[in-house]
């Protein structure tokens, strides 16, 4: 198995577990270790191995691990836990995940069927891409004028889903004020190790949602300029 596949499987659970040990370590992981890791990955891995699947594998492992944390540690799929997550919250998350997955598979399917003979050639995909915008290493495909709208739909669904997951995990670990049907998280550091893991996983999901929101805003601004 290539190193680009092994590293995300080891690093993601290990870093989140490390962050759950103490709030100081959580700050260290999110403010220093993760940014440094991706800076090194961009400068070293991409430079010497541009076709690496490291970032794509990181995306896949992140999605699977966060879903595992939610289902096993929060909902209690395999054993009985206090039912703090309502059915509609769970349904909203499942529908969001399903929508994100469906839009991603559609993107992948359309890109795999592309047989362009003109446009820019992507040095990573090694195919012609007409109206190329950029190569998304996290999805392992090129984004162009032909799929930019679907890409933005994927971003929107993923932002909403990861944001919703972040809210549920953090409010489960640190329940705060009830705003209508929504339980907001409070500032705390839980006593139980499981709750600490839920909290840092929720923070991680929130960071992902924030970064993707900035990307979506950037894409929307560029699209408006081209109108």
Language model: regions and residue ranges:
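Hydrophobic, well-ordered secondary-structure segments
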Residues: 102, 119-122
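Short cysteine-rich clusters marking metal-coordination/redox-active sites
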Residues: 113-115, 122-125, 136
């Amino acid at each position: 198995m290539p190193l680009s596949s092994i590293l995300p499987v080891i690093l993601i659970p290990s870093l989140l577990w490390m962050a759950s040990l103490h709030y100081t370590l959580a700050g260290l992981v999110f403010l220093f270790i993760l940014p440094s890791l991706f800076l090194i990955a961009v400068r070293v891995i991409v430079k010497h191995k541009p076709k690496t699947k490291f970032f794509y594998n990181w995306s896949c492992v992140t999605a699977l691990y966060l879903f595992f944390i939610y289902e096993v540690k929060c909902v209690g799929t395999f054993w009985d836990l206090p039912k703090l997550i309502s059915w509609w919250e769970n349904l909203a998350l499942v529908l969001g995940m399903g929508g994100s997955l469906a839009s991603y598979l559609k993107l992948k399917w359309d890109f795999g069927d592309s047989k362009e003979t003109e446009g820019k050639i992507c040095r990573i995909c090694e195919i012609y891409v007409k109206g190329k915008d950029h190569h998304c290493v996290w999805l392992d495909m090129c984004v162009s004028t032909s799929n930019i709208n679907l890409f933005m739909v994927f971003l929107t669904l993923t932002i909403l889903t990861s944001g919703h997951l972040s809210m549920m995990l953090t409010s489960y670990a640190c329940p705060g004020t009830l705003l209508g049907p929504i339980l907001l998280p409070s500032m705390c550091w839980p006593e139980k190790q499981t709750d600490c893991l839920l909290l840092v996983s929720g923070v991680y999901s929130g960071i992902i949602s924030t970064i993707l929101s900035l990307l979506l805003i950037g894409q929307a601004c560029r699209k408006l300029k081209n109108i």
